[in-house]
Amino acid sequence: MQQIDDTRLDALMGRLVGEFGALASAPLVILGDRLGLYKAMAGAGPMSADRLSAKTGLRVRYAREWLNAQAASGFVDYDPVEETYALSPEGGLVLGEPDSPAFMIGGYEVLSAMFQDLDKVQKAFVDGTGLGWHEHNACLFSGTERFFRAGYNANLEPSWIPALDGMAERLRAGARVADVGCGFGASTIVLAKAYPASTFVGYDYHEPSIAAARERAREAGVADRVSFEVAGAKTYPGRGFDLVAFFDCLHDMGDPVGAAKHVRQTLADDGSWMIVEPFANDRVEDNLNPVGRIYYSASTMVCTPCSLSQEVGLALGA
């Protein structure tokens, strides 16, 4: 038997206790979002459990226990003298304001899907098969949209589009844009709001997502210049697009090379292909950090199985 280093053992066990706490608190974050608890606290200053209960209509005993868990997690500040709880302005941006560029609740919905789909991914591991995007729990779809929408709101018009030479001017004048792998249409709608003279079509093979995207476009008031169609990355119709965009989806595709060839066929001669992907280093050792940990985990549960379920199955992963 190998000799055990007690110091290292204690450190690992201590770290896992912290992991247990993080995992146990995750459902409470989702509850805080679903029940409007964070929104009720955002900008309201210190409040007691009774006041939060009155604002939300929830039973005070539940409100108090939830607040104590939030304080233990460091998400809210607790005043032991006044017995009040406060969500900081920063906490409001991260937890209570869906349109904030720092909003992160969507990521918790993605984590929820990962747990709910555990048996399916386990089967794929054993069988060596894949798990299609459409086979996941529905909270993956909504969570992905909510998580990435914050970044699209913050970056698409101010920095990403201007990074393509002359593209902002073309979009302002009126261009044809295809958004491939659009999901619920967050990126498409952000672009349509920013460039009302252009026309946009979002493509996704997942029919429920396309239905949701159409409804979102109507709600946003951009349905006059935005349409959504069910189509894959290698089969979407249309020619002569001034811009084809792939936002956070290329690495999930089974045949990204085939998708790239199709993009070339559908672009105008002077068109541009815009690819936005989460940043990762090329070497494993350079990704052994908190962000890399999230990427490798999400890739194991979602991205790699998704690619392996498709033709070619290149499985780029994280």
Predicted features along the sequence, with ranges:
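A short glycine-rich, Lys/Arg-flanked "PGG" loop and its adjoining helix->strand segment in the class I
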Residues: V257-D269
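Conserved Class I S-adenosyl-L-methionine-dependent methyltransferase catalytic core
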Residues: T7, G14-A40, R64-A175
